[in-house]
Amino acid sequence: MTASATRQRPEADLGTAEWLVCDGCRRMIYGRRFARGGHVCPECGWHARLTATQRIALLLDEGSVEVVDTPVTAADPLQFVDTRPYADRLRSARTSTGLTEAVVVARGRIEGCPVVTAVMDFRFLGGSLGAAVGEAITGACEIALRERTPLLLVTASGGARMQEGALSLMQMAKTAQAIGQLDEAGILTVSLITDPTFGGVAASFATLTDVIVAEPGARLGFAGARVIEQTIRQTLPPGFQTAEFLLEHGVVDLISPRGQLRPTLARLLGVATRRPGTAPVTPGDGHSAGDGRGAGDSRGASHGGDGVVRDPARLADRHPWEAVRLARRLGRPSTLDYIGALVEDWTELHGDRAATDCPAMVAGLGRLDGTPVVVIGTQKGHTATELAARSYGMPSPGGYRKAARVMRLAAKLGLPVITLIDTAGAHPGLEAEQNGQAVAIAENLRLMAGLPVPVVAVVTGEGGSGGALALAVANRVLMCANAIYSVISPEGCAAILWKDPAAGPDAAAALRVDARALLAAGIVDGVVPEPDGGADVDPLAATDALRAALTGALAELAPLDPPTLVTARRARFRRFGTPAPAGGAAPAPVVPAARPPLGAGRTHADLDDARRAS
């Protein structure tokens, strides 16, 4: 691929009829108004298709565009003829569109953020995926890899190009592995799904990116609705395969109207490309990373500059049931309340990419005091309506899988993870069990233990059992002063062991669910102060205290390299329940010995793949 000599912004072909009829609402629209609005109906919001040139002009900063020449591969490998020779169809498409193929590759910037983009054009044989398109998409990936620049794919396709036979099919694998190389290199990839995106494109590079953005009403799928209805006679629901349907079912991350695409994409690119720097570290207490109290750990102090209480004697000695009552108050700030006050450039990501978007779990990217972070948390609500809509803050298996997906993105991009926990526990019930609730929780525990980035967890309200722990395998585990954290709810424990749910206060005391007891036991590393009367009395003060605690914890962890972070985190949890010699420390975790060398040209990954295959 070579860059064209021109660096001028492509002229958008805004020529249109004086008046036209909207395909969405069938109303008459003044053509120039329609063009000025990005080809979006001002009456109903219907988004018309754009050419690749129009799309590039819409998205990239003026003066930043450098179109990359893409070589045209074998034009007609099968000498294919149906009602018309394929070679004739190619010539006609090139003449009518002015393009050599169904994709345009360019470098540029979006609100100052560098990006490599590949933009498909549906006018060219329905945006079908053939060898030339596959080569262009792969070439764009290779440019992004070589220049370590985020990749933006704008898709519009009816599927594979049948006239190229199995060669077209191979482009799915070719482009998929190119995306995989960007994953390995830690480079952000984003898809913008436009209408329509189907077949081989949908089942390869379009849906393999880190973030999937869709325009309103855009359709995405493997088999089209007509194919499904005709082959298996299945009745499909209204809105099937639209962006809105797919958002509800966890396939796309967000829907962005065309007028908001540039700021939406710029937020994503900005967070992903400006990595957090190191920060001054609070002097440690001399312990090594191996016991989970490495550099920057200040749990021996009563207070740090972050305001976190680390000495249980400085916390009020009260009955734990008081904390239970305060932790459950509906007025307490929720995860989204804290995010709204603390996180700049917030972009929420949706869905587990499988079937669901659990409303009880929120996750996304943003900045905390300028530091790019990933924030994940359970969300309850403040009213009965909100609680019901959010499943009472009890995540489904899909919620935990959504959290895991975003944690993996954090690991890929090298971003710290913050989790905010306020849940009575994982959602119980038939559907949760059918979908593998236990497996989802277990997989999160394993995943978090090995994340190569700083992880800070805060129990802000209720920390209920494994459903809370699935977000709390962290380098620093904090809790708010009036939060609780327990293996079971006090009422549940009372019902089982006391045979009387009314014995909840007794169970709370026996379980030691309060911050003072948990800090003394080392379950949490520090306690975030709350205003007198609770966080709901003065949410601003509670937010300020949480900000100080989070920024302090991240500053402590920022200088640590990935192996140290992982070793320290594993050591932290390794020591729980481990008998220690009198006056001595708990056993250090076992560090695997170096693997023996392999033959020339082979890697351990090759060996592992071979074992799995066998």
UniProtKB/Swiss-Prot annotation:
Extract the ranges annotated as region (Disordered): 272-314, 577-614
> What is a single cellular component term in the Gene Ontology annotation?
acetyl-CoA carboxylase complex
- Chief localization: cytoplasm
Top-level EC class? transferase
EC number(s) on file:
2.1.3.15
What Pfam family is a match for this entry?
A: Carboxyl_trans
Say which species the protein is native to. Parafrankia sp. (strain EAN1pec)
Locate the residues binding Zn(2+): C22, C25, C41, C44
Q: Briefly, what is this protein's role?
A: Component of the acetyl coenzyme A carboxylase (ACC) complex. Biotin carboxylase (BC) catalyzes the carboxylation of biotin on its carrier protein (BCCP) and then the CO(2) group is transferred by the transcarboxylase to acetyl-CoA to form malonyl-CoA.
Q: Where do the CoA carboxyltransferase N-terminal domain residues begin and end? A: 18-287
- Which protein, by its recorded name, is this? Acetyl-coenzyme A carboxylase carboxyl transferase subunits beta/alpha
**Domain of life assignment:** Bacteria
User: Which reaction(s) does the protein catalyse, per the Swiss-Prot or TrEMBL entry?
Assistant: N(6)-carboxybiotinyl-L-lysyl-[protein] + acetyl-CoA = N(6)-biotinyl-L-lysyl-[protein] + malonyl-CoA
- Classification via NCBIfam families: accA, AccA_sub, accD
Zn finger intervals (C4-type): 22-44
Domain named CoA carboxyltransferase C-terminal is located at 311-556
Q: Which GO terms describe its molecular function?
A: acetyl-CoA carboxylase activity; ATP binding; carboxyl- or carbamoyltransferase activity; zinc ion binding
Positions of the UniProt region annotated as Carboxyltransferase: 18-556
Residues annotated as region Acetyl-coenzyme A carboxylase carboxyl transferase subunit beta? 1-250
